[in-house]
Amino acid sequence: MGLFIAQILTGLANAGALFMVASGLSLIFGVTRVVNFAHGSFYMLGAYVGYSLMQVLPGMVGFWGAILLAGLIVGVIGVIVEICVLRPVYSAPELFQLVATFGVILVIQDLALMIWGPTDLLGPRAPGLKGVIRIMGEPVPQYDIALIIITPFVAFALWYLITKTRVGTLVRAA
Protein backbone atom coordinates (compact mmCIF):
# COMPACT_ATOMS: atom_id res chain seq x y z
CA MET A 1 0.00 0.00 0.00
CA GLY A 2 2.88 2.35 0.79
CA LEU A 3 4.33 1.92 -2.70
CA PHE A 4 0.92 2.74 -4.20
CA ILE A 5 0.70 5.97 -2.16
CA ALA A 6 4.27 6.90 -3.14
CA GLN A 7 3.43 6.35 -6.81
CA ILE A 8 0.29 8.48 -6.49
CA LEU A 9 2.33 11.29 -4.92
CA THR A 10 4.98 11.03 -7.64
CA GLY A 11 2.23 11.21 -10.25
CA LEU A 12 0.75 14.29 -8.57
CA ALA A 13 4.16 15.97 -8.51
CA ASN A 14 4.70 15.23 -12.20
CA ALA A 15 1.20 16.49 -12.96
CA GLY A 16 1.99 19.69 -11.06
CA ALA A 17 5.13 20.28 -13.11
CA LEU A 18 3.24 19.63 -16.34
CA PHE A 19 0.44 21.96 -15.21
CA MET A 20 2.93 24.79 -14.74
CA VAL A 21 4.38 24.30 -18.23
CA ALA A 22 0.97 23.82 -19.86
CA SER A 23 -0.54 26.88 -18.18
CA GLY A 24 2.24 29.03 -19.62
CA LEU A 25 1.71 27.58 -23.07
CA SER A 26 -2.04 28.10 -22.78
CA LEU A 27 -1.65 31.74 -21.69
CA ILE A 28 0.71 32.47 -24.57
CA PHE A 29 -1.63 30.85 -27.07
CA GLY A 30 -4.58 32.74 -25.61
CA VAL A 31 -2.86 36.08 -26.09
CA THR A 32 -0.98 35.56 -29.36
CA ARG A 33 -3.09 32.88 -31.06
CA VAL A 34 0.19 31.27 -32.11
CA VAL A 35 1.03 27.68 -31.15
CA ASN A 36 4.53 28.25 -29.85
CA PHE A 37 6.51 25.06 -30.46
CA ALA A 38 9.51 26.79 -28.86
CA HIS A 39 7.84 27.03 -25.45
CA GLY A 40 9.74 24.02 -24.10
CA SER A 41 13.01 25.35 -25.50
CA PHE A 42 12.60 28.47 -23.38
CA TYR A 43 12.22 26.24 -20.30
CA MET A 44 15.41 24.43 -21.33
CA LEU A 45 17.20 27.75 -21.79
CA GLY A 46 16.00 28.87 -18.36
CA ALA A 47 17.39 25.70 -16.81
CA TYR A 48 20.78 26.23 -18.45
CA VAL A 49 20.91 29.91 -17.53
CA GLY A 50 19.85 29.06 -13.97
CA TYR A 51 22.55 26.38 -13.77
CA SER A 52 25.19 28.85 -14.93
CA LEU A 53 24.04 31.50 -12.46
CA MET A 54 24.10 28.95 -9.61
CA GLN A 55 27.78 28.37 -10.34
CA VAL A 56 28.44 32.08 -9.75
CA LEU A 57 26.00 33.02 -6.96
CA PRO A 58 26.73 31.49 -3.52
CA GLY A 59 24.53 29.39 -1.24
CA MET A 60 20.79 29.49 -0.72
CA VAL A 61 20.52 33.06 -1.98
CA GLY A 62 22.41 31.91 -5.05
CA PHE A 63 19.96 29.11 -5.80
CA TRP A 64 16.75 31.11 -5.46
CA GLY A 65 18.33 34.25 -6.89
CA ALA A 66 19.55 32.25 -9.89
CA ILE A 67 16.06 30.84 -10.45
CA LEU A 68 14.48 34.31 -10.39
CA LEU A 69 17.21 35.91 -12.48
CA ALA A 70 17.08 33.09 -15.05
CA GLY A 71 13.33 33.61 -15.36
CA LEU A 72 13.83 37.32 -15.96
CA ILE A 73 16.60 36.75 -18.51
CA VAL A 74 14.59 34.17 -20.45
CA GLY A 75 11.53 36.41 -20.22
CA VAL A 76 13.46 39.23 -21.89
CA ILE A 77 14.69 36.80 -24.57
CA GLY A 78 11.08 35.69 -25.05
CA VAL A 79 9.97 39.30 -25.56
CA ILE A 80 12.72 39.80 -28.14
CA VAL A 81 11.68 36.62 -29.97
CA GLU A 82 8.03 37.72 -29.87
CA ILE A 83 8.88 41.11 -31.37
CA CYS A 84 11.35 39.86 -33.98
CA VAL A 85 9.90 36.47 -34.97
CA LEU A 86 6.27 36.10 -33.92
CA ARG A 87 4.80 39.54 -34.63
CA PRO A 88 5.66 39.37 -38.34
CA VAL A 89 3.79 36.04 -38.66
CA TYR A 90 0.66 36.83 -36.62
CA SER A 91 -1.41 37.35 -39.73
CA ALA A 92 0.30 34.57 -41.69
CA PRO A 93 -1.22 31.09 -42.08
CA GLU A 94 -0.71 28.69 -39.17
CA LEU A 95 1.88 26.67 -41.08
CA PHE A 96 4.19 29.71 -41.29
CA GLN A 97 3.72 30.32 -37.57
CA LEU A 98 4.63 26.72 -36.77
CA VAL A 99 7.70 26.86 -39.02
CA ALA A 100 8.80 30.13 -37.38
CA THR A 101 8.52 28.71 -33.86
CA PHE A 102 10.23 25.50 -34.98
CA GLY A 103 13.07 27.67 -36.27
CA VAL A 104 13.30 29.28 -32.84
CA ILE A 105 13.63 25.77 -31.34
CA LEU A 106 16.56 25.01 -33.62
CA VAL A 107 18.30 28.30 -32.84
CA ILE A 108 17.89 27.91 -29.05
CA GLN A 109 19.05 24.27 -29.12
CA ASP A 110 22.11 25.10 -31.21
CA LEU A 111 23.00 28.04 -28.97
CA ALA A 112 22.66 25.79 -25.91
CA LEU A 113 24.95 23.22 -27.53
CA MET A 114 27.51 25.90 -28.38
CA ILE A 115 27.47 27.46 -24.91
CA TRP A 116 26.98 24.47 -22.56
CA GLY A 117 28.03 21.55 -24.77
CA PRO A 118 26.36 18.17 -25.27
CA THR A 119 27.11 16.82 -21.79
CA ASP A 120 24.28 16.52 -19.27
CA LEU A 121 24.54 19.08 -16.49
CA LEU A 122 23.25 18.30 -13.01
CA GLY A 123 22.35 21.28 -10.89
CA PRO A 124 21.81 21.25 -7.15
CA ARG A 125 18.49 20.46 -5.50
CA ALA A 126 16.62 23.33 -3.94
CA PRO A 127 18.00 24.15 -0.49
CA GLY A 128 15.83 22.55 2.16
CA LEU A 129 14.29 20.10 -0.31
CA LYS A 130 17.14 17.62 -0.68
CA GLY A 131 15.88 14.81 1.51
CA VAL A 132 13.04 12.34 1.47
CA ILE A 133 9.96 11.89 3.60
CA ARG A 134 8.93 8.36 4.44
CA ILE A 135 5.24 7.72 3.86
CA MET A 136 4.14 4.27 4.95
CA GLY A 137 7.78 3.19 4.73
CA GLU A 138 8.29 4.42 1.17
CA PRO A 139 10.59 7.36 0.37
CA VAL A 140 9.00 10.36 -1.33
CA PRO A 141 11.30 13.27 -2.27
CA GLN A 142 10.67 16.48 -0.35
CA TYR A 143 10.81 18.30 -3.69
CA ASP A 144 7.79 16.29 -4.89
CA ILE A 145 5.83 17.14 -1.74
CA ALA A 146 6.68 20.84 -2.18
CA LEU A 147 5.53 20.71 -5.81
CA ILE A 148 2.23 19.08 -4.78
CA ILE A 149 1.68 21.81 -2.19
CA ILE A 150 2.70 24.74 -4.44
CA THR A 151 0.69 23.73 -7.53
CA PRO A 152 -2.80 24.54 -6.14
CA PHE A 153 -1.54 27.97 -5.02
CA VAL A 154 -0.17 28.66 -8.50
CA ALA A 155 -3.45 27.47 -10.03
CA PHE A 156 -5.43 29.77 -7.72
CA ALA A 157 -3.10 32.71 -8.43
CA LEU A 158 -3.50 32.19 -12.19
CA TRP A 159 -7.27 31.89 -11.85
CA TYR A 160 -7.38 35.07 -9.78
CA LEU A 161 -5.11 36.91 -12.22
CA ILE A 162 -7.17 35.90 -15.24
CA THR A 163 -10.66 36.38 -13.75
CA LYS A 164 -10.34 39.17 -11.17
CA THR A 165 -7.74 41.66 -12.41
CA ARG A 166 -7.44 44.22 -15.17
CA VAL A 167 -4.48 42.31 -16.61
CA GLY A 168 -6.65 39.21 -16.77
CA THR A 169 -9.40 41.12 -18.53
CA LEU A 170 -6.88 42.31 -21.12
CA VAL A 171 -5.51 38.77 -21.56
CA ARG A 172 -9.01 37.36 -22.04
CA ALA A 173 -9.87 40.12 -24.51
CA ALA A 174 -6.78 39.45 -26.62
Question: What is the role of each PLM region?
Answer:
Residues 1-32, 37-174:
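Small-residue-rich transmembrane alpha-helical segments that form helix-helix packing/gating elements
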